């Protein structure tokens, strides 16, 4: 019996449009949890990203002399927009999202030839571009609604995104405050800041934002994306090897790190159920174009992402490291595929 590996082209019986729609549908549980805990901004950002992505897709296709309607209906641009909208802070200024989304479609996707040709995950290229260019705004997350000092409705969220102030005149800095008057951040941000200030991990994690496995709200968001990821596995939209390797590698690395230096690192459960862990493992790392295509290669690729996530979270300057980890792993895909390609029957061993 011989192992066969698919070529880099898609051969799934499901049409591209169906696959893209299934992935977007699978995002729904995490999206609902994210909207529930962090407000309407997530919905507004996602809709704005959709309009921008589809507009840029149509413009570039027309300039390239390609058919516009089939490409718009295949769902690839829409999926990129959804992933961008879910990855960005809910109240990020609208023009930053437009810049990131346009860059993802025009540069990260079409500069390489369009659908199926991109070397890097377009959504993560957009995220990293914005994070490097606007680090303050990209780390300005709202506190979960249960501990927020201000109730932010749909109108307030839209007003902050498009004007910088809520309907009552509150700035983003004021809206970031929790009920205790302290400026809030994500659990991973809070931990990184506390460790930088000389506190131990156990001291930092007494903060109320760390309630639950991955922090208030974030545990449910990650459970939502985990549920969506299991749906994709059941539908055979994604291969199990990549998310299993990502989560397994991250769990192993974070467990060893926690056992070695418990006062200087997050718990394994916080690594798994905070930040973009489940979104990254099931929806971003599994991009069929930029991920490895061989069976062994997918395990290596996923394990590399999980290890890089831990190392960047532990030693790097950015608390949530999934975008950087995925892009670095994308760079390694040609080498990984070359080293893990099954031998052709009858080929002489070197």
At which residue positions do the language-model features occur?
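Loop-to-transmembrane alpha-helix initiation sites
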Residues: 119-124, 269-277, 298-300, 316-327
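Long hydrophobic alpha-helical segments that form multi-pass transmembrane helix bundles
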Residues: 122-223
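N-terminal signal-anchor module of multipass membrane proteins
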Residues: 1-62, 343-349
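A beta-strand-loop signature enriched in Asp, Gly, Thr, and Trp
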Residues: 243-295
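C-terminal ends of transmembrane helices
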Residues: 4-7, 55-67, 105-116, 226-237, ...
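A generic, well-ordered mixed alpha/beta core segment in the N-terminal half of proteins
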Residues: 80-154
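Structural signature of hydrophobic alpha-helical transmembrane segments
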Residues: 40-52, 91-100, 208-223, 265-277
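Alpha-helical transmembrane segments in multi-pass membrane proteins
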Residues: 22-29, 48-57, 76-81, 85, ...
């Amino acid at each position: 019996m011989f192992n066969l590996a698919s070529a880099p082209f898609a051969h799934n019986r499901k049409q591209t449009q169906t696959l893209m729609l299934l992935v977007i549908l699978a995002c729904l549980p995490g999206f609902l949890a994210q909207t529930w805990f962090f407000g309407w901004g997530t919905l507004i950002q996602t809709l704005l990203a959709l309009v921008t992505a589809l507009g840029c897709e149509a413009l570039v296709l027309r300039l390239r002399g390609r058919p516009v309607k089939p490409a718009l209906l295949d769902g690839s641009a829409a999926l990129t927009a959804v992933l961008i909208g879910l990855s960005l802070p809910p109240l990020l200024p609208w023009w930053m999202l437009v810049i990131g989304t346009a860059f993802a479609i025009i540069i990260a996707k079409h500069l390489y030839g369009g659908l199926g040709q991109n070397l890097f995950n377009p959504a993560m290229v957009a995220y990293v571009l914005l994070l490097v260019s606007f680090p303050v705004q990209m780390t300005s997350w709202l506190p979960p609604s249960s501990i927020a000092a201000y109730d932010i409705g749909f109108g307030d969220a839209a007003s902050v995104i498009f004007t910088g102030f809520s309907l009552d005149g509150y700035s983003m800095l004021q809206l970031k405050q929790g009920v205790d008057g302290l400026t809030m951040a994500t659990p991973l941000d809070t931990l990184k800041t506390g460790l930088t200030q000389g506190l131990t991990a156990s001291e930092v994690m007494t903060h109320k934002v760390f309630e639950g496995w991955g922090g208030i709200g974030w545990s449910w968001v990650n459970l939502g994306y985990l549920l969506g990821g299991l749906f994709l596995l059941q539908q055979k939209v994604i291969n199990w090897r990549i998310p299993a390797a990502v989560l397994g590698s991250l769990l192993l690395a974070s467990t060893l790190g926690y056992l070695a230096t418990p006062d200087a690192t997050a718990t394994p459960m916080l690594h798994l159920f905070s930040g973009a862990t489940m979104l990254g493992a099931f929806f971003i790392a599994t991009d069929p174009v930029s991920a490895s295509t061989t069976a062994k290669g997918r395990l290596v690729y996923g394990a590399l992402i999980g290890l890089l996530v831990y190392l960047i979270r532990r030693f790097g300057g950015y608390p949530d490291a999934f975008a950087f980890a995925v892009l670095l792993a994308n760079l390694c895909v040609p080498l990984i595929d070359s080293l893990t390609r099954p031998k052709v029957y009858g080929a002489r061993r070197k």
